[in-house]
UniProtKB/Swiss-Prot annotation:
This is NEDD4 family-interacting protein 2. GO terms for cellular component: Golgi membrane; membrane; multivesicular body membrane. Residues 7-22, 38-47, 102-120 have a biased composition (Low complexity). Residues 26-37 have a biased composition (Gly residues).
């Protein structure tokens, strides 16, 4: 480009010099010839300079084309940057963003061809990432830690605060009423290997008669043995009844015997006291035993209780 511009400047300078050096007389005739000669000389000079530039390896300068510059700039920009499209609008953009001319198709193909070889360390494109669907185990874990709320119909049908408090009070009252009966049933659990009389520790008539005769015959010694050995109501009440009758027996023996006349002379009130005490012991043991036996037979099975009559 510099050689071509230098050639033009030199040609212009020579033409101007030739026109100034011409004499005034020959101005009219030489004007035409001088103009032609200057033009021929300029052409020859430019041709020589162009050949010299070609020999040196330089190309003659040409007028820059603005369209070509724009195309080169577009190609450089397209090759350097990659055009990305949205995945969701991929189908729509493929139909809308088509190239209008053949000049835009070539840069797009070049950009697509050069895109995979940009950088091996760059992350993969978003379209190559596959999203895994949630499995049933993840769904179960999510529902376990975050339970699903109840539907609107269930949430609106819940009782009010007053109704909930009344229901709670009724439940507490029912539990308090059932507690004594439950404790009583636990304390008095029925046993199949014993009869009802043995379960209540009432005893039977045989034990009552055995303790009665033991206390009646052996007096106070029999009373102590029968009362301490037996652990039933029949045996203890039999011992009390026999001891009372034994006391009455000895009072009558002492009163109507000639051997003990000196002991009760003038003291009749003393033997009356022992006689009444013996009668009370006899009737108390006999009546209480009959009462307990009848009560044990008439009681319901769920409300039976063990009775211990300790004196």
């Amino acid at each position: 480009r510099r050689s071509a511009s230098d050639a033009e400047l030199s040609a212009g300078a020579e033409g101007a010099t030739g026109s100034e050096a011409a004499p005034p007389g020959d101005l009219g005739g030489r004007t035409r010839g001088g103009g032609r000669g200057s033009a021929a000389a300029a052409a020859t000079t430019s041709t020589r300079e162009a050949e010299g530039a070609e020999r040196r390896g330089d190309t003659p300068a040409r007028k820059p084309d603005p369209e070509a510059g724009r195309m080169d700039h577009h190609q450089l920009g397209t090759g350097r940057y990659q055009v990305l499209h949205n995945e969701e609008d991929n189908s729509e953009s493929s139909a809308v963003e088509q190239p209008s001319t053949s000049s835009l198709a070539a840069p797009t193909v070049e950009a697509a061809a050069s895109a995979p070889a940009l950088d091996p360390d760059s992350p993969p494109p978003y379209s190559s990432i596959t999203v895994e669907a949630p499995t049933t185990s993840d769904t179960d874990v999510y529902s376990e830690f975050y339970p699903v709320p109840p539907p609107y119909s269930v949430a609106t049908s819940l009782p009010t605060y007053d109704e909930a408090e009344k229901a709670k009070a009724a439940a507490l009252a029912a539990a308090a009423a059932d507690a004594p009966q439950r404790n009583q049933e636990e304390d008095c659990t029925p046993r199949d290997d014993f009869s009802d009389v043995e379960q209540l520790r009432v005893g039977n008539d045989g034990i009552f008669m055995l303790a009665f005769f033991m206390a009646f015959i052996f007096n106070w010694l029999g009373f102590c043995l029968s009362f301490c050995i037996t652990n039933t109501i029949a045996g203890r009440y039999g011992a009390i009844c026999g001891f009372g009758l034994s006391l009455i027996k000895w009072i009558l023996i002492v009163r109507f015997s000639d051997y003990f006349t000196g002991y009760f002379n003038g003291q009749y009130w003393l033997w009356w006291i022992f006689l009444v005490l013996g009668l009370l012991l006899f009737f108390r043991g006999f009546v209480n035993y009959l009462k307990v036996r009848n009560m044990s037979e008439s009681m319901a099975a769920a409300h039976r209780t063990r009775y211990f009559f300790l004196l």
